[in-house]
Design a protein with these regions (language model features):
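Residues forming the flavin
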Residues: 2-52, 58-149, 153-368, 374-382, ...
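Inter-lobe coupling/hinge segments of SF2-like helicase ATPases
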Residues: 485-558
């Protein structure tokens, strides 16, 4: 017999299987001889009151042993000889797109500008040790993408974007801890994630797919309104339908799209700083205990959000027991991010603290503020004209403006400009700075002075509000480190028909394999795609070469 229980127990009970069994015996009246096994299905921490509890969903097995695996396996068949699809980018989007293509009977060919997940480590070390940023291999580019070496959190509030449990199961199938199936805020950890990513790549190759590293897409091949494939920096072309999974930092791709009349537009982003506290202080605040988290609780997390002058100010990508890392993807930039190892054992905890920014918010910035970006255009974007502040790339150029300004304030190295938290709210220069986890080092700088006022003033007001909610958070023990700009992509596709993945103007089509195959086709017994029309609208027919993209003006994935 199997029975499930919703329990609210003390941390020491949740952490010990024997004590959990004793709790079930005494509180739920179970017979000790009948309990053969227990399994925790879900786990979350309730730290709203002084006494901390752990909420558990527990399955008890009575007079029988568990038969099912802790996670569900996905079957990946061999796709050698099947029609190939080009996937540009080997980040999480590209890797999962490739795995989904295999499920659909198509052969993925991944093209990644950076290095494999192990070789990337050398280039990441160079950023801290020698202040050198390899524009093709860094925290943003390379196998695993931006998340491979920046934490590996797997938390989403969205409930409408597909089967989240399947994603977690795929991670477990490739070596992640099964704890991610249980915890309310799943976390793999920067030290564990590279092995998982490597295993995912091996699955793709073993099933007949290909992965090409240090191969950058320079242009899409378009003939007679059809995307035929891609051109790369190696001189090699790859033919087939194309999925762009290039991430939020591939600005040369955005420039190419804009220069070739792709239907994209500027979208809202969030920018701000990394805020770093001593981990013991955050534990004391969140767990309401001067002694911190004790033996049975993990490093404490926090989440803050408020409206300030009509814009959201909120914490982002909180990394308990983590490190602040240099995440620039090119020269003359400073960008910071956060990461945590799986044990979250660092002496510091950090989080992005960002302000919501909309395209209309930067209208006050004239074209003169953005002139420096001309020199930052590369390769296929060399002939791209500098956009106005209202153009489709305006938010991207604003990101570049802040990142270069931050680099200048950091003595034109990867030493990041920083300021104590209370000093920032009082508009005072910090004459010294606390110890930090940021390896390249910090330099004291008046962030309140050089950051755009519509960002700095909202951050200051937000910090004061958060300090009222959580006593002790607003302190000069905390350090603001600039700047955090890569919270999301600065462009998106323009509006399209709701019933297809087509552009409203040109019947241009983008299809990603994670979408329901029901819209575009079903897999036949021989593994081919049968194209179908949508019942709700008149969608165009596609040639076999245009499953993914078709037309000279096509929509781009954001």
């Amino acid at each position: 017999m199997i029975q499930e229980y919703q329990l609210r127990v003390l941390p020491e009970v949740a952490a010990n299987e024997q004590r959990l069994k004793e709790y079930l015996i005494h509180e739920k009246g179970l017979n000790a001889r009948e309990i053969t096994a227990t399994r925790i299905l879900k786990r979350s921490i309730d730290a709203r009151q002084r006494t901390i509890y752990v909420n558990l969903n527990v399955r008890a097995y009575l007079n029988e042993m568990p038969k099912e695996d802790e996670y569900q396996h996905t079957l990946y068949n061999n796709v050698e000889g099947k029609p190939q699809v080009i996937v540009v980018g080997a980040g999480p989007g590209g890797l999962f797109a490739a795995l989904r293509l295999i499920e659909l009977g198509l052969r993925p060919v991944i093209v990644e500008r950076g290095k494999d997940v192990r070789e990337r480590k050398k280039d990441l070390a160079q950023i801290s040790r020698q202040q050198l940023v390899n524009p093709e291999s860094n925290y943003s580019f390379g196998e695993g993408g931006a998340g491979a070496y920046s934490d590996g959190k797997l938390y989403t509030r969205s409930k409408k974007r597909g089967n989240v449990d399947k994603i977690l199961n795929v991670f477990c199938q490739h070596g992640a801890s099964t704890s991610i199936l249980v915890d309310a805020h799943p976390h793999i950890g920067t030290d564990k994630l590279p092995r998982v990513i490597e295993n995912m790549r091996n699955t793709i190759i073993q099933c007949g797919g290909e992965v090409h590293f240090e191969t950058r897409m320079d242009a899409l091949l378009i003939e007679k309104d059809e995307v035929k494939g891609i051109e790369t920096n190696t001189g090699k072309t790859f033919l087939g339908p194309v999925i762009l999974a290039t991430g939020h930092s591939a600005r040369d791709v955005y420039r190419w799209l804009a220069a070739n009349n792709v239907e994209i537009e500027a979208k809202g982003i969030a920018v701000g700083v990394r805020l770093e506290h001593p981990a013991t202080l955050i534990d004391q605040i969140q767990y309401h205990n001067r002694n911190g988290r004790g033996k049975y609780l993990p490093a404490a997390e926090y989440s803050f959000v408020n409206q300030v002058d009509g814009r959201g100010v909120y914490s982002f990508c909180m990394c308990p027991g983590g490190f602040v890392v240099p995440a620039a993807s090119g020269p003359e930039q400073i960008v910071v991010n956060g990461m945590s190892p799986s044990n979250r054992g660092s002496r510091w905890s950090n989080s992005g603290m960002v302000v919501e920014l909309r395209p209309e918010d930067i209208e006050q910035f004239t074209i003169d503020n953005l002139q420096f970006t001309i020199s930052m255009q590369h390769d296929s974007a060399a002939n791209c004209q500098l956009p106005t502040v209202n153009s489709q790339l305006s938010m991207m150029y604003f990101q570049e403006y802040l990142e270069r300004l931050c680099w200048q304030q950091g003595n034109m190295k990867q030493t990041a400009p920083a300021q104590r938290m209370v000093d920032f709210t009082k508009k005072k220069l910090s004459y010294d700075l606390p110890e930090t986890s940021y390896a390249p080092g910090l330099v004291s700088s008046p962030l309140h002075f050089w950051m755009p006022s519509f960002i700095a003033e909202r951050l200051s007001k937000g910090f004061q509000l958060f300090g009222k909610y959580s006593r002790g958070l607003l302190t000069n023990e905390a350090t603001m480190i600039g700047v955090e700009t890569r919270t999301s992509a600065p462009v998106r596709r323009r509006s399209r028909r709701s019933c297809t993945l087509c552009s409203p103007e040109r019947r241009s089509c983008v299809w990603t394999p994670t979408r329901s195959a029901r819209r575009m086709g079903t897999k036949s017994s021989c593994g081919s795609l049968k194209k179908k029309r949508s019942r709700s609208c008149s969608a165009p027919r596609w040639s076999p070469r245009a499953w993914i993209l078709r037309t000279s003006r096509w929509s781009a994935s954001s």
